[in-house]
């Protein structure tokens, strides 16, 4: 009887041991996946920051002597506020350049409020995320910036563009630019109602003194 009890206890102990081993293995797998995903997220953020810096550097290279360039400009009009990634000002106008460093594939149409961003991680896992339609974002930026300038007595045409660093725009649109050459041509095309030197200096002062915030 004692032997049978001992065998039963040993079997029970082995079962508990195997369960503990299984739990430990599962925990290690979970931690490995979590670490990989966090590492993947950090890499994406790092890539986004590098892309932003690269864009700013490339934008400056297409500017002419009299062009003004500003980055990360905060603008407030009434209860509305926005931040502009890149802003170029010259006699031909005021140009907003919104940079999107989307990886993977983008799905959506012009009328959609949200687009679907889809990509695969290095481990083959599918990631899907809904992002705001940047066309709506840029239209809003155009409105806020033009009204903010008008509040300070400057009537000027503000034009916004979206640059996809990975060239993965879901469709063709006048708001999208695909190369710096295209942008250079746009910002240096003759305007029938150009900004005066006085207006350009006023705009420069408003931005540098943060009076648009």
Predicted regions and their residues:
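Surface-exposed interaction regions that form or flank ligand-binding interfaces
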Residues: 4-82, 88-95, 100-110, 114-213
């Amino acid at each position: 009887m004692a032997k049978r009890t001992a065998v039963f206890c040993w079997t029970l102990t082995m079962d508990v041991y195997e369960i503990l081993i299984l739990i430990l293995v599962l925990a290690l797998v979970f931690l490995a996946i979590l670490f990989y995903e966090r590492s993947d997220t950090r890499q994406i953020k790092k890539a986004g920051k590098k892309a932003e810096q690269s864009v700013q550097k490339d934008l400056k290279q297409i500017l002419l002597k009299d062009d003004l360039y500003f980055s990360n400009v905060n603008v407030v009009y009434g209860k509305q506020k926005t931040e502009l990634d890149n802003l170029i000002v010259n006699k031909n106008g005021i140009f907003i350049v919104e940079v999107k460093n989307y990886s993977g594939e983008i799905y959506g149409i012009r009328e959609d409020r949200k687009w679907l961003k889809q990509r695969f991680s290095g481990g083959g896992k599918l990631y899907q995320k809904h992002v705001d339609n940047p066309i709506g974002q840029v239209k809003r930026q155009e409105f806020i910036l033009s009204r903010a300038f008008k509040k300070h007595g400057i009537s000027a045409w503000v034009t916004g563009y979206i640059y996809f660093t990975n060239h993965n725009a879901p469709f063709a649109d006048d708001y999208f630019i695909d190369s710096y050459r295209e942008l250079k041509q746009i910002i240096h095309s003759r305007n029938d109602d150009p900004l005066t030197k006085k207006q350009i200096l006023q705009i420069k002062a408003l931005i540098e003194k943060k009076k648009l915030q």
